[in-house]
């Protein structure tokens, strides 16, 4: 119906093509099985997984989950757009036997009362680039790329990456190149 109302709409065309392709994919499945990671998936929104560490034995991701151990009295700011709890960054580690452990929330220096998500790490693992979305009712609501550096075993307070001069351009979902010369977003 939408394509009839908007002939030539690329969105409508892509939607139809996606539905047609999905039925073909179901008829010809791959050998890969996608399943829920019961150890650390929750019923809340979770996205932006990024492996970390020399052995890739750590996984960072964003989630709207309430951190373990946080009582109902914990101050939680909800997102004005989604109505859900704001996203924070979480970390999951593998133990010496390769078993994934329960997720833990990152330090307060990175996680704030606003949205954080989609981390990317420098090759040496000492710099993290991530999306930060403040919700200033008096100012623009936009996403920015923040940078945090690791000292000892903790991430430091994130600082805004100076990429554009204005404060209303939305920047997010950073990915640093392996050589550290390029930041894709």
Q: What do these predicted regions represent?
A:
Residues 3-185:
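Short, conserved micro-motifs composed of acidic
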């Amino acid at each position: 119906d939408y394509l009839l109302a908007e002939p030539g709409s690329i969105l409508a065309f892509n939607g139809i093509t996606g539905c047609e392709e999905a039925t073909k994919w179901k008829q010809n499945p791959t050998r890969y099985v996608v399943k829920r990671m019961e150890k650390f998936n929750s019923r809340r929104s979770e996205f932006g997984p990024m492996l970390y560490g020399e052995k890739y034995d750590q996984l960072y991701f964003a989630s709207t989950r309430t951190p373990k151990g946080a009582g109902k009295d914990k101050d939680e700011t909800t997102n004005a757009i989604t109505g859900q709890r704001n996203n924070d960054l979480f970390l999951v580690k593998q133990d010496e036997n390769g078993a994934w452990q329960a997720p833990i929330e990152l330090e307060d220096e990175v996680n704030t009362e606003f949205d954080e998500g989609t981390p990317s790490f420098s090759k040496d693992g000492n710099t993290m680039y991530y999306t930060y979305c403040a919700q200033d009712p008096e100012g623009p609501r936009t996403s920015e790329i923040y940078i945090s550096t690791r000292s000892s075993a903790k991430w430091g307070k994130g600082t805004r990456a100076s990429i554009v001069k204005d404060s209303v351009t939305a920047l997010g979902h950073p990915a640093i190149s392996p050589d550290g010369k390029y930041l894709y977003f």
